[in-house]
């Protein structure tokens, strides 16, 4: 059998797929030829198969370096569910388990060993020397670079692998890395003339929406309505601070939403419990800081919300990538305010890599303020160009309409000028709205001619308009002067009537009714592959129930048994024999033998 046929047969037998995704076959062939590689592939794009399949085809054990115990656990469970011998050597095991794992590695009974960078460095002169290693895979490789968004110092020592094991190929994998990070990965790992594979970063199943100028109460209301529209679907809410994760979670819990909290300030036990509850669908939502997510391989996360502006496009892209890993339609929402921008600018200015972090934040700001296709901006950031708009972001769905906003701009700039440019955004809105706040009255600003000049415009709309004015360059924020607003020459031209100002019309969504929150998710979304009708929905729910029952029996996450995508395909194909069940994409030989009878018997009840 030639190499290509062997690769395809292994893919079908263990993973249940008839064909490779773009670049996978090329990457696997390259690794089988004992060559180093750097693989950039989006979350859900099939990175893992790029090293798991070569591990199955080569003699010996593949050593996979992974930064999180939870990520190792998830990967190992998925491999075992596919009938592949795998294990994870880490501190969560007891000593007996680790002794058994070491013996299995030395005896060649494992095809893949997952290990943390710290553990690998401790074992490089001991266990690794006694093993027959087929390849090294460095997962989440961006952690090696100080320019990356998840820098881990211990990753920088991975360069010793090529020195000690010069004949063993190394493949580094990441979902997000700009050019400078890619170069740093290659240099620090001492990769030997590596080939760099860059897959498309496009995730067309993920919708992109930005909501600007929302205050806390408005955000909370919008989030509740969003969750109600999504029924019981799983989602993640990312917040900038630990305190905010807890206040948002408490708000959701009071509304009866099953919600957990995850941040670095909680105990390891608490974080593990939250993650396990989420993976096993015991809670619907996790409110988290950026500490959450890298260890999540949950394929049926249907939405991601950013409560605050992320610090970089890399962080943002990786976090929205938690949604829709199964390829089904998923939604993301980013809330953006001037307060976020001011705070993040302060953090970036005080960081060790001030210039780089400010540049990354500026690119994130440009994305949030864009009035062109947002997906094109994301793809362009990662060096990928496209000539077509996506049709699945808020800009494409509702192209911005402009109006003559000269008077609005003049009111704002006049208020700034009359305070001698000594006010911040919040105080400016108080003046324009005519609010007798303590700060307004304390400084006598209620006597200004512009006091109350904009009371007909809601606070949220003022936030949006001021964001637009900042983007248009009518004023700047003096971050080193208590965030005071300074009028630019362009702003002066508008203020004194020398030029006009065009602003974008703010679009307001209608609120979801209380009745609407109980409405079932539309079948067209649940069954995007063409199935329709209540009977299909009933079958899908029955399949989901059986999957949960089987998963609970084995103490596994439900998506490890079968993904939502596979359940949808079962709804459409309705196999009535075990052989037909095994033909479904995503069902390998092991799962066919293990689960085929139960699922086929259930499907027959709907067919006969």
Please annotate each region the language model reported:
Residues 1-7, 356-358, 387-608:
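Accessory DNA-binding and partner-docking regions appended to nucleic-acid-acting proteins
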Residues 353-382:
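Short, charged low-complexity linear segments at domain edges
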């Amino acid at each position: 059998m030639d190499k290509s046929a062997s690769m395809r047969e292994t893919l079908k037998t263990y993973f249940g797929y008839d064909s490779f995704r773009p670049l996978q076959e090329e990457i696997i062939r390259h690794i089988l030829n004992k060559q180093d590689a750097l693989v950039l592939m989006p979350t859900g794009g099939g990175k893992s198969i790029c090293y798991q399949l070569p591990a199955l085809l080569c003699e010996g054990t593949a050593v996979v370096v992974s930064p999180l115990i939870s990520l190792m656990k998830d990967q190992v469970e998925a491999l075992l569910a596919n009938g592949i011998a795998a294990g994870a050597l880490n501190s969560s095991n007891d000593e007996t388990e680790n002794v058994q794992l070491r013996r299995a590695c030395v005896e060649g009974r494992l095809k893949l060993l997952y290990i943390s960078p710290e553990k690998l460095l401790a074992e490089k002169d001991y266990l690794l020397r006694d093993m027959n290693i087929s390849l090294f895979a460095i997962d989440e490789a961006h952690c090696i670079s100080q320019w990356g968004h998840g820098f881990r110092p211990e990753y920088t020592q991975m360069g010793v692998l090529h020195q000690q094991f010069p004949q063993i190929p190394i493949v580094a994998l990441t979902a997000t890395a700009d050019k400078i990070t890619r170069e740093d990965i290659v240099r620090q790992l001492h990769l030997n003339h590596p080939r760099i594979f860059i897959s498309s970063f496009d995730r067309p199943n993920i919708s992109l929406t930005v909501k600007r100028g929302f205050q806390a109460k408005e955000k909370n209301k919008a989030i509740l309505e969003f969750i109600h529209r999504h029924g019981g679907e799983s989602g993640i809410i990312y917040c900038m601070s630990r305190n905010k994760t807890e206040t948002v979670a408490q708000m959701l819990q009071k509304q009866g939403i099953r919600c957990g909290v995850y941040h670095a300030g909680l105990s390891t036990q608490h974080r593990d419990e939250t993650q396990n509850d989420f993976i096993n669908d015991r809670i619907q939502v996790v409110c988290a800081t950026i500490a959450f997510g890298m260890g999540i391989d949950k394929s049926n996360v249907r939405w991601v919300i950013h409560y605050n502006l992320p610090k970089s496009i890399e962080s943002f892209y990786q976090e929205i990538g938690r949604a829709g890993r199964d390829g089904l339609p998923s939604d993301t929402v980013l809330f953006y305010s001037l307060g976020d921008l001011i705070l993040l600018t302060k953090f970036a200015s005080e960081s060790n890599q001030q210039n780089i972090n400010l540049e990354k934040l500026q690119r994130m700001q440009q994305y949030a303020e864009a009035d062109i296709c947002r997906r094109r901006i994301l793809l362009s950031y990662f060096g990928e160009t496209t000539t077509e708009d996506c049709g699945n972001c808020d800009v494409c769905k509702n192209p911005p309409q402009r109006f003559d906003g000269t008077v609005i701009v003049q009111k704002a700039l006049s208020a700034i000028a009359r305070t001698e440019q000594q006010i911040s955004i919040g105080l400016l809105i108080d003046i324009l709205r005519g609010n007798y706040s303590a700060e307004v009255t304390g400084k006598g600003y209620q006597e200004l001619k512009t006091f109350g000049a904009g009371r007909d415009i809601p606070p949220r709309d003022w936030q949006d308009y001021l964001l637009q004015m900042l983007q248009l360059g009518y004023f700047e924020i003096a971050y080193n002067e208590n965030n005071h607003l300074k009028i630019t020459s362009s702003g002066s031209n508008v203020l004194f009537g020398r030029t006009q100002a065009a602003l974008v019309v703010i679009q307001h969504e209608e609120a979801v009714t209380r009745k609407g929150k109980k409405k079932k998710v539309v079948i067209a979304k649940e069954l995007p592959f063409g199935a329709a009708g209540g009977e299909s929905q009933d079958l899908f729910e029955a399949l989901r129930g059986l999957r949960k029952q089987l998963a609970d029996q084995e103490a596994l996450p439900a998506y490890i048994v079968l993904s939502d995508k596979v359940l949808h395909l079962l709804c459409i194909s309705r196999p009535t024999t075990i052989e037909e069940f095994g033909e479904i994409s995503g069902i390998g030989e092991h799962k066919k033998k293990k689960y085929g009878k139960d699922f086929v018997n259930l499907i027959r009840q709907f067919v006969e």
